[in-house]
Amino acid sequence: GSGKSTFLRLIGKLQEGTYQGNIRINGILLEEINMDSLYGKMGIVFQEPYLFGFSLKENIIMGRNVKDSDYEAILKKLNLGYLLERFSDVELDTEMVAKLSGGEKQRIALARAMVGKPQVYLLDEITSSLDEQNAREMEEILLAEDAMVLYVCHKIIPELKGQYEMLTF
């Protein structure tokens, strides 16, 4: 590829590497940003999300103090409300995770990022396993967030294209 995913990993300080030029977040050089403060303000979702052998709720809140109403609202916002009944407090085993569609896994991973109310989202191909309707809804949800969204993708919904500030390679 052209380095889009690597670029996101560099910004999230998940990978070290050499590059030309400077990377700044809100005007601050990436090298000068405190790692602890950076991770507390970022929501990161990769193209291939990982789900742990925990309950659905534990997979999303990841030990954070989150009100049940906020957790449920995020699931409903991402069209995952039906999973509340299906997997409420059941631990997700390998077989259950295998039965989830790629789009469901992706939306669960986005819910995990959203529940932390990040200031910056780093998103790598998060709509690639979604049908067009779900991809559109997810993009609209992200565009409505009060956060910076760095979104690596191969295709953007044409009608939403004008709402992005784009960086292309």
Give residue spans per PLM region.
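Conserved ABC transporter NBD signature motif
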Residues: 20-28, 38
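ABC ATPase nucleotide-binding domain helices that frame the ATP-binding cleft
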Residues: 5-8, 108
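Conserved "ABC signature" C-loop
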Residues: 49-95
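Helix-to-loop junction immediately C-terminal to a conserved catalytic motif
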Residues: 12-13
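ABC ATPase nucleotide-binding domain
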Residues: 35-43, 53-54
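Walker A (P-loop) phosphate-binding loop of ABC-type ATPase nucleotide-binding domains
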Residues: 1-3
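ABC-family ATPase nucleotide-binding domain "signature/switch" substructure
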Residues: 59, 93-169
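ABC ATPase nucleotide-binding domain signature
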Residues: 41-50, 64, 155-156
